[in-house]
Amino acid sequence: MPSSNGSSDFVRKLFNMLEEPEYRHILRWSDSGDSFIVLDTNEFTKTILPRHFKHSNFASFVRQLNKYDFHKVRHEEGAPSIYGEGAWEFRHDDFQLHHKDLLDNIKRKAPSKRNLANENTAPVIENLKQQVDSILDFQKLLDRNLSGLATSYQTILLKMFELKRGIESRDLLMSSIISYLCDLEGSTQRQANPGAMFVPSHPLQELLNAYQALAKGQVATTSPQQIPNQIQQASAATTASSKMTVDTNLGTAQPSLYNTPSSDYELANQEKPADSMASAASLNTPLSSNDHSLNPHAHGSYPMYEKFQPIQHPNPGSFTTHLDSNASMAKSFSQISNDSLAKASSVATSMSQMGAAVPTTGLWKRQPRILLVEDDELSRRMTIKFLTSFDCQVDVAVDGIGAVNKANAGGFDLILMDFILPNLDGLSVTCLIRQYDHNTPILAITSNISMNDAVTYFNHGVTDLLVKPFTKLTLLQLLKKQLLNLLQADNSINMSDVPSTKEAKDDKAPVTFYLENDAPMYPQQMLQDPIQADLQHPH
């Protein structure tokens, strides 16, 4: 019968078989009676195991004996067994001949501590697996939520950018209206009393004071904001493309609203930000070639206009649109003198000669790093070929978002960018870059550009223009102009060949842009920084 600690039927059955003479030729007691011997393991496996024990092989029977603490008797090494070569002898202290009463002491061994530990750790391991699965599921949920938050964040950024552009457009419209009112009132006063100095009326002065106070408050709370690298996500790229396209269409539909600098980029770089905001009133004055009386500068300098300072480009080493307060703003492009055009042509000719004389190797103190943003493969290959021949390191972006990401990484000496790009247009890219980088020159590659477009580009952070199609020499001259700090001393541009600022003022015929055969020409591509220009609206 089985005991409380394990069944002893196996032991009793084995003892009874040893008592029977039927199996003595296979299984018997030892001569001393304190052990038993399996004489023939093969016969034991074939005859006894299938009939009396539930074991299929002798090894399983031996394992069963070990569970009841039977041990195999090992003879001295090399000594033959007295019961034959294939005999197996097993012993247990309570398994002896004629001592059946001791069989109750033979119990099945308790599981080892190792097995017990394994059994105890199984539930723990299963519990840990469940916890890991729960953590993985929770992580997936967090990833989905984070992705949604990132998308929402990008959408909010674009909405904020659109709102900012809308506020800028509103401010420019307000400044244009105020400027028009000033001109209208000044014209009325001059018609009544031509020799009198213009003094704004009380309502107009209150309007000007209120606008200046509003401008001061906006400048005080405005600061450049970093554009994050999350724009590199492909999902946000599509959103950015559609949003910026709408934004660009807004700027195209209302070109008059972008005729003066108004972004945070320009405001943050003014010594007198309040005056800079107020100066929009004088810069947005509507001009007509047939009516010069609306322009106060044509009739002397009035105190109200003297405090409106021209907005300067934040990079003094790059191209800037200069305004000469002593020149007449009533002059239209059709009235530019032949002497002015000849002077601009002489500057371009002298610069072309100097550029041709400079070799394209050994130009730089170190290799300039250029970011080229161009989606057209043919133009990109040609420009890269030119730049590498000038010993420049070139990195390439093929769309607007890629350009923002690479510019955000920094380390570029100059950005050469086509303004017709996928995902983000060049103007939007420039506005984004200028919010955290005010110094790197940005050269716009463009063609068929109008005067309003050119002014818009400069007002929003573009340093200079490179008009298609351009030559290798033109590109080299523009690089030398914008990267003067990297030029070797013997390759520096000779400033004596360029008319001085004083001479330009005395001639009163400075030229920034002029039109030839309905196509804009840009002498400032060569070297126009020392020349102050009058921006005039053509007919």
UniProtKB/Swiss-Prot annotation:
One of its GO terms (cellular component) is RNA polymerase II transcription regulator complex. The modification Phosphothreonine is found at residue 221. The modification 4-aspartylphosphate is found at residue 418. It is found in: Nucleus. It comes from the Eukaryota. The keyword Transcription regulation applies. Keywords: DNA-binding, Nucleus, Phosphoprotein, Sensory transduction, Transcription, Transcription regulation. Residues 251-281 are annotated as: Disordered. SMART domains: HSF (SM00415), REC (SM00448). The modification Phosphoserine is found at residue 223. GO terms for biological process: positive regulation of induction of conjugation with cellular fusion; positive regulation of transcription by RNA polymerase II; regulation of transcription by RNA polymerase II. GO terms for molecular function: DNA-binding transcription activator activity, RNA polymerase II-specific; RNA polymerase II cis-regulatory region sequence-specific DNA binding. Residues 251-263 have a biased composition (Polar residues). Residues 7-111 bind DNA. Gene3D superfamilies: 3.40.50.2300, Winged helix-like DNA-binding domain superfamily/Winged helix DNA-binding domain (1.10.10.10). InterPro entries: CheY-like_superfamily, HSF_DNA-bd, Sig_transdc_resp-reg_receiver, Sig_transdc_resp-reg_Skn7, WH-like_DNA-bd_sf, WH_DNA-bd_sf. Residues 369-483 form the Response regulatory domain. Involved in oxidative stress. Transcription factor that acts upon trr1 and ctt1. In the N-terminal section; belongs to the HSF family. PANTHER family: HEAT SHOCK TRANSCRIPTION FACTOR, TRANSCRIPTION FACTOR SKN7. This is Transcription factor prr1. It comes from Schizosaccharomyces pombe (strain 972 / ATCC 24843). The gene is prr1.
